[in-house]
Amino acid sequence: MLDKRKFYINGQWVDPVKKNDFEVINPCNEDPFAVISLGSKEDTDLAVKSAKNAFETWKETSKEERLSLLEKLSSVYKKRFNEMAEAISLEMGAPMDWATDVQTASGKDHLDDFILRLKNFKFDEHFDNKSNNHIYYEPIGVCGLITPWNWPINQIALKVVPAFATGCTMILKPSEIAPISGMLFAEMIDEAGFPKGVFNLVNGDGAGVGTHISSHPDIDMVSFTGSTRAGRLISKNAAETIKRVCLELGGKGGNIVFADSYKDAVRDGIRNVMSNSGQSCDAPTRMLVEKSIYERAVKEAVDEANKIKVDQASKKGDHIGPVISKIQYDKIIDLIESGISEGATLAAGGPELPNGLNKGYFIKPTIFTDVTNEMRIAKEEIFGPVLSIIPFETEDEAVNIVNDTSYGLGNYLQTEDREKAHRVAKKLRSGCVYINGNGADAGTPFGGYRQSGNGREGGVWGLEEYLEVKNVTGWS
């Protein structure tokens, strides 16, 4: 078993103030493979003190100094790329090909894109030619970064790298059920030579370290990715000290498939929602299909879902692995059973374990038809390989169904009518709209409307989240 009990504070791996062991479970076999420590208020205080002290000098570094360190970090990441993939595969059950080509690659892509954006970013500028006002963009200060288990290094890179780039210092709390990738990233940061105290890592759960971070008076900003329920608690805790809060929360993405969609739109939609075992906050979990092609679409969807293999993470291939934990597994199975009891038609998959997999948190790719938007499976975030198919007749009806949710992270639409695509995209209430299977480029903004959060991650928008804006008059 891996011994990962230490925290990274002030440039050193240190023992926790109080012993509080926590076993990390391999979701493929339900066995513990590592032990970490859950931090205390005292551990958090030490990390915050370290970051606060380091901020006094780190904030004065030049853009060129920070770029040099980030470029070194990129080189270290490239060198240890396969280690990161192995860590992600082990901690969250991601098949090795997916862990390597998608999960680990996304962290490198974000790191390199932030380096590019930083090179072109201006930290001060004159207001305009007729004004004697000058604008400064300054680091907000000490940041508390709380990241999830479903896209571990992706989210760590989206928070840690822009904080570095803008001159902030930080405390990272990765998910306690998938912490190994975050600890490996801390090793990379140390190897790259970042000054002591600029980056600190304390493991812990949400009720402990998460609460200490979000309520700490010496933390100036919290960036959190996770559930909407937890996001509400983060916001309440942060309100006492009026700290900035950036939230990327849950979603219930709609995927509108019009009759004039491209040939493989339905099959691609199935592959999309089932990827990462359905554990993506912007997954297109509601497929809305125009009635004239509904029967054909259902047949294609069921056929494609039945083709998707479920297997061990250690195997190579394009299969999906387990979901992350027993808690998530039980929640997903409960929602599948609710779909059956509420009258939806189970067209593929179901609550039983896949053939040949008698241990682990494996779930079959599951499809429901005859779904109404009032059912739990259509309203609640499932976070597993489960899709609801809903028919519609008109464009306005489809838009209304998609927008009939408290979420607003990512929505999708499929049509070969470019004018229609643009028109519908403007009507959808979400931070991202994906047309005809096209993904978002690195450096574009990612974030949600309504209860999917606030703020944006990625690119220039991601840098700006960590900056204060100062106006200076009488400049000239």
Per-range role (PLM):
Residues 1-90, 263:
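Short, structured beta/alpha segment
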Residues 29-35, 219, 256, 309, ...:
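Conserved C-terminal structural/oligomerization subdomain of aldehyde/semialdehyde dehydrogenase
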Residues 30, 66, 88, 111, ...:
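Residue-level signal for inorganic ion chemistry
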Residues 32-39, 54-60, 145, 255-257, ...:
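Short, well-ordered beta-strand elements within core beta-sheets of diverse protein domains
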Residues 49, 71-82, 96-121:
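Long amphipathic alpha-helix in the N-terminal Rossmann-like dinucleotide-binding domain
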Residues 122-264, 392:
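Rossmann-like NAD(P) dinucleotide-binding subdomain of oxidoreductase/dehydrogenase enzymes
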Residues 129-133, 350-356, 439:
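Short, solvent-exposed loop/turn elements at beta->coil junctions and helix N-caps
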Residues 229-372, 435:
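ALDH superfamily catalytic-core signature
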